[in-house]
Amino acid sequence: MHTRKAITEAIRKLGVQTGDLLMVHASLKAIGPVEGGAETVVAALRSAVGPTGTVMGYASWDRSPYEETLNGARLDDKARRTWPPFDPATAGTYRGFGLLNQFLVQAPGARRSAHPDASMVAVGPLAETLTEPHELGHALGEGSPVERFVRLGGKALLLGAPLNSVTALHYAEAVADIPNKRWVTYEMPMLGRNGEVAWKTASEYDSNGILDCFAIEGKPDAVETIANAYVKLGRHREGVVGFAQCYLFDAQDIVTFGVTYLEKHFGATPIVPAHEAAQRSCEPSG
């Protein structure tokens, strides 16, 4: 049974320091049994960064109608009338991004951003700075909490989560100067100041496949491809927390690498011809 002290020490051994801004992607199952459960993991993370540090997570929303309204799909009138609006104060989190985020949301002093599908949660001195504003149309790119996380010198921590979980690399996708980016539209029920509900349409870069060759089912997306290439450079930290294999990345460094990688291989004048890259399902040339 893993204790709070042991988890805190393991996180610090990875390279997390007092005062750090930490975006966490966690698999509680991978960590293994913890005395006190997920609340203990949250407490250990907060202990690792100390009172001057901030912990951030990708909460999203368990009732997000993203798939139901994607690219022109439309809910029937009854569903639109009865679908709950997104309220950062009460909305649940999407479990596909890890159960830990629900416990971050419940932590004292937690702040949550207002973008329903890309909602972020943060706890610590930078929580408000990170989470506000967060408007539709700015999910993970410019103007988003992820941009501010990168700009403020954050670190991305994978606690047993796979390499395709590095959300900061979606920011790299958004700002990289490459042609033929995929776009999506969707609708979200937003809560107005007077309690009214309004369905609003958003247009965003497709974080499920920024290019066609990264949107092939069963193949690595851009995030996983870039993260794998970055790990080979050895500029990150690796270790074990509980039973989980973990990675710690400097967000600015991996994002800079990601932007360069995308522009090198898929820019207007890529080193790798676009048709060859597509044939390789976006695998790097070496």
From Swiss-Prot:
Lineage: superkingdom: Bacteria
Catalytic activity of the protein: a 2-deoxystreptamine antibiotic + acetyl-CoA = an N(3)-acetyl-2-deoxystreptamine antibiotic + CoA + H(+)
Enzyme class, spelled out: transferase
UniProtKB keywords: Acyltransferase, Antibiotic resistance, Plasmid, Transferase
GO function terms (MF aspect): aminoglycoside 3-N-acetyltransferase activity
Function: Resistance to antibiotics containing the 2-deoxy-streptamine ring including gentamicin, kanamycin, tobramycin, neomycin and apramycin.
Protein family (similarity comment): Belongs to the antibiotic N-acetyltransferase family.
Record protein name field: Aminoglycoside N(3)-acetyltransferase III
Protein's organism: Salmonella sp
Gene that this polypeptide is encoded by: aacC3
